A protein has these predicted regions:
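Canonical Rossmann dinucleotide-binding motif of NAD(H)/NADP(H)-dependent dehydrogenases/reductases
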Residues: 2, 6-40
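Alpha-helical segment proximal to the catalytic Tyr-Lys
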Residues: 139, 183-184, 249
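Residue(s) in the substrate-gating loop at a strand-loop-helix junction
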Residues: 154
Length: 266
């Protein structure tokens, strides 16, 4: 989509983490549809990264699958090196996250029932992963004199969430990091903003998703929102696209709730 598109990305190269499914996939596709010059698709699962890269190429946009564990600094450096085949990365979306397999079901253990190794897993992906990607991406952005960094955080980091203490702490740390980078990098034409999410529809097949959304657990979750539904991947992608575009060129250090009104509807 080019021409009079106010969200036209001007052929810039994007690197999206956690892009193999759900919101990350939607973000990668949205950037491709709005004139990104190429998209580096990063995901922990190589097959998912490759599948989304193929979807983007089918749109006529260059893409490369660059799978890695974002918590592994050496792996992140290698992923960015592979992305250089597309050109210099000036759009970074830190979407990769880990809340644990049972978070949306309310079956995570109490904090005092967890082990330190559990905390490490949450901090590795949700905070260290963001720092790793920014540390590798920023030198090139500074060299280019421009850049957009968008980081997905969580309402859990702002208000707290029972049975997700380590996850909430990591996401709160990421939100603080976003603001610090905004202060450091702004003079180089680089913005740093965050999107704060609540619960998204789980990445299931249509039948399983319909069953979950009709469940009492899903109804309990959505009862906390002014808009009585769970978030959808495209909801997140729309905000990420805006923050990556020139329409947001004088916005930095901000955290935008994309949460159906959870911020005030409790």
């Amino acid at each position: 989509m080019i021409g009079n598109d106010p969200l036209d990305l001007g052929g810039q190269i994007a690197f999206v983490t956690g892009a193999g499914q759900s919101a990350g996939r939607a973000i990668a596709l949205a950037l491709a549809k709005h004139n990104a010059g190429g998209v580096a698709v990063n995901d922990f699962v190589p097959e998912r990264a490759a599948a989304v890269a193929a979807e983007i190429e089918a749109l006529g946009v260059r893409a490369v699958a660059v799978p890695s564990d974002v918590g592994d600094y050496a792996a992140v450096k290698a992923a960015f090196a592979a992305a250089e085949a597309l050109g210099p990365v000036t759009l970074l979306v830190n979407n990769a996250g880990n809340a644990g397999p049972n978070a949306s079901m309310g079956r995570s253990p109490n904090f005092w029932e967890t082990e330190p190794g559990d905390w490490d897993r949450y901090f590795r992906t949700n905070l260290q992963g963001v720092m790793n990607c920014c540390h590798v991406a920023l030198p090139e952005m500074v060299k280019q004199g421009k850049g957009r960094i968008v980081t997905v955080v969580s309402d859990a980091g702002r208000v707290g969430e029972a049975k997700l203490a380590a996850y909430a702490a990591a996401k709160a740390g990421a939100a603080g990091f976003v603001r610090s980078i905004a202060r450091e990098a702004g003079r180089f034409g680089i913005t740093s903003n965050a999107i704060s999410l609540s619960a998204l529809e789980p990445p299931m097949d249509d039948e399983a998703k319909a069953a979950f959304l009709a469940s009492e657990q899903a109804k309990l979750i959505t009862s906390r929102y002014a808009i009585r539904r769970m978030g959808r991947p495209d909801d997140v992608a729309a905000m990420a696209l805006f923050l990556c575009s020139d329409a947001a060129s004088w916005i930095t250090g901000q955290t935008y709730p994309v949460n159906g009104g959870y911020s005030f509807a409790q």
